[in-house]
Amino acid sequence: MVSIAFYGGIPGGISTPITQQSEKSKCEENTIFQPYCYNNNSKNSMAESKEARDQEMNLKEESKEEKRRNDWWKIGMFLLCLAGTTGGILWWYEGLPQQHYIGLVAIGGRLNGSGQSNAIECWGSFPGCRPFQNYFSYETNRSMHMDNDTATLLEAYHREITFIYKSSCTDSDHCQEYQCKQVNLNSSDPSNSVRVEDVTNTTEYWGFKWLECNQTENFKTILVPENEMVKINDNDTWIPKGCNETWARVKRCPIDILYGIHPIRLSVQPPFFLVQEKGTADTSRIGNCGPTIFLGVLEDNKGVVRGNGTACKVSDLNINRKDYTGIYQVPIFYTCNFTNITSCNNESIISVIMYETNQVQYLLCNNNNNSNNYNCVVQSFGVIGQAHLELPRPNKRIRNQSFNQYNCSINNKTELETWKLVNTSGITPLPISSEANTGLIRHKRDFGISAIVAAIVAATAIAASATMSYVALTEVNKIMEVQNHTFEVENSTLNGMDLIEQQIKILYAMILQTHADVQLLKEKQQVEETFNLIGCIERTHVFCHTGHPWNMSWGHLNESTQWDDWVSKMEDLNQEILTTLHGARNNLAQSMITFNTPDSIAQFGKDLWSHIGNWIPGLGASIIKYIVMFLLIYLLLTSSPKILRALWKVTSGAGSSGSRYLKKKFYHKHASREDTWDQAQHNIHLAGVTGGSGNKYCKQKYSRNDWNGESEEYNRRPKSWVKSIETFGESYISEKTKGEISQPGAAINEHKNGSGGNNPHQGSLDLEIRSEGGNIYDCCIKAQEGTLAIPCCGFPLWLFWGLVIIVGRIAGYGLRGFAVIIRICIRGLNLIFEIIRKMLDYIGRALNPGTSHVSMPQYV
């Protein structure tokens, strides 16, 4: 393609290139005045020009950046909408009432400090309750109005008024309607045979009136006392007393675990609630009935007794009934002797829980003669298919074998009061209607694991502060800065405990949840296995009537007290750690001040003997430690003269050596800076020190006492070089020389008694160390540099030589003792060898006597 551009004038004065192109290169909707191929859809077909390309690239980048900005805006709006939607869903879910949750509730404990032998406790909820420590409460909603005294059992455990939820027990057999008729039990013959008679007007037998009840078309008939049932209409329809009258509430426990509405349970001993029976004020009474399984009437008083031959005895009675089919369940009769039990409102009927090794029985007892003898009968609705949960667990027995009376008198109080509960056993689903609290609740510190972490960090901070304070002995001006920094570190550590606690709380709640899940699944599996083994006589959708007594080998998943021990131990550690932290924080400033005072050195001297037992391994606080200390003190006292003499020699020698060194250094420095006359004077001085009086110098050298620079001979006779100085005259001494020679001597000798200040050499021997705001470390450093005398560091030298002498003396005593032992052994061996030698010599002489001349007789 060939393009030729013609530039021509256009009317109006505008010069525009005119382009001629081939047919293939022509673009749509172009004009003759446009130098570019123009397209409305794509405006990027430019002329062949470098500047045009750059402009095109810039436009593309700007469009992309604008597009990105638009994309970020869209993403932000999308996230905002997503967050709003999520928050709305969460808000809706938080406020959504969750009905009929099955919570993990422990059954089978007691009220703290009372004879109430059964109660419920929150065991495994997430995460508002803590097992065995943070107990929840329950309450009833029945008002009691009497003119008597207070209801002390309720008032003793008053905590707070909370929300109320109605319990659900309509699924239980104990809340079903029964068809009952009144009967009389007549025992006229002496064979303990009791006849059942249908009558209209009933009389008491064994202290109670009786009913025959069934709900299975005579397949199963139950003979029960009339006190356990309540008639609801005129058609002989009865229900167990207390059904649908108990209101209960689980406090502060989000029941958010759902294992099914109807789990299979083997045997449940329910908690007891005080409820007021409906009736007039004169007949109102307090009954005990659980929220999930109603055991009928547990009357005003409840005693707990140990089942034995002395307390209660079984009466063997034969119940005879005419013409019946199916199962006829008769009660068990007891004659009991109870002491210290008083009924409420002076009524004759009391309720007694009798526990034995393998089972628990609920008795209704009647006392007609105001004595200690009671006629008792086992409650039919107090036993679930003869399967029981033993009341006192083997490791959690009731404190007292029997309990005294309950003060059950009532005044104008209400039962809207909560009770504090104690540890319980077992896990039982409790169906309630509640609003699920699905959020985490900030509760009290659980285990205090964060306190352990904070203790480690705080201990590190305290150790660091102690180290920095010790270093600050030589830097007094930095102590306040170090102290402030240490306080900042410790405050940050203590403030960080809350953040760590939040993490620990979530972890702890997860552990509790997992533990509760595992326990429930294990118990459920064991229950199902037990059902498969023993079978069921009668089974509903909730309960299985087995016909077997409770066995101690069943349901022992929660017998271990390891969890309780862990919780109590962690609580103790938590309190101890917090106490230690506060004590360390309060004493930190005082410890810093102590480190910065000379008292620390004095305290080290006081504590020196207390550390000797630690220096010698294995001594401890035994008597050997005191023996060793006595020997060390004895050796130190006996060796003190020699030690002092040796130390005096060492220090005096070091002082003389230092004085000689300083003297030579002093004169050498001044002689190098003065004129020839000063050099000559220095040579004369050296000649007087080293050359003159050779014999006396040798005497000083080999003298027994070390030369200290001030011997009597030196002071008595002036040296020849002194006279030589005087002969020259003072006219040759310059003012500068006078100042340099006389001034040091005067300044040094002004501390020496009896000195005139005219002998600079004598003063140089007694140079006094002056500390200018330094300490022993600066002194030693200056001594190493040669600017101070060595005696500055004499104390470590004394200590070293003293320890060497003590160790040497101990070693000498040891070696001498060893030599004495060897000498005694050698003497003993020599004595033994001498005795053996003499014995052998004696025996040898006896066996080999000396030759004797024997004359034979001669015959003539």
UniProtKB/Swiss-Prot annotation:
Q: Where is this region: Fusion peptide?
A: 447-467
An example Gene Ontology biological process: virion attachment to host cell
Residues listed as glycosylation sites in the UniProt record: 40, 112, 141, 148, 186, 201, 214, 235, 244, 308, 337, 340, 346, 369, 400, 407, 412, 423, 484, 491, 551, 558
- Top-rank taxon of the source lineage equals Viruses
A GO molecular function assigned to this protein is:
structural molecule activity
Cellular compartments per GO CC: host cell plasma membrane; membrane; viral envelope; virion membrane
Entry's transmembrane regions: 615-635
Q: What's the PTM story here?
A: Specific enzymatic cleavages in vivo yield mature proteins. Envelope glycoproteins are synthesized as an inactive precursor that is N-glycosylated and processed likely by host cell furin or by a furin-like protease in the Golgi to yield the mature SU and TM proteins. The cleavage site between SU and TM requires the minimal sequence [KR]-X-[KR]-R.
What keywords does the record list, in alphabetical order?
A: Cleavage on pair of basic residues, Coiled coil, Disulfide bond, Glycoprotein, Host cell membrane, Host membrane, Host-virus interaction, Membrane, Transmembrane, Transmembrane helix, Viral attachment to host cell, Viral envelope protein, Virion, Virus entry into host cell
This chain's protein is named Envelope glycoprotein
Role of this protein: The surface protein (SU) attaches the virus to the host cell by binding to its receptor. This interaction triggers the refolding of the transmembrane protein (TM) and is thought to activate its fusogenic potential by unmasking its fusion peptide. Fusion occurs at the host cell plasma membrane.
Coiled-coil spans in chain? 577-625, 664-700
Self-association or partners: how does it assemble? Answer: The mature envelope protein (Env) consists of a trimer of SU-TM heterodimers attached by noncovalent interactions or by a labile interchain disulfide bond.
Which residue numbers fall in the propeptide? 1-6
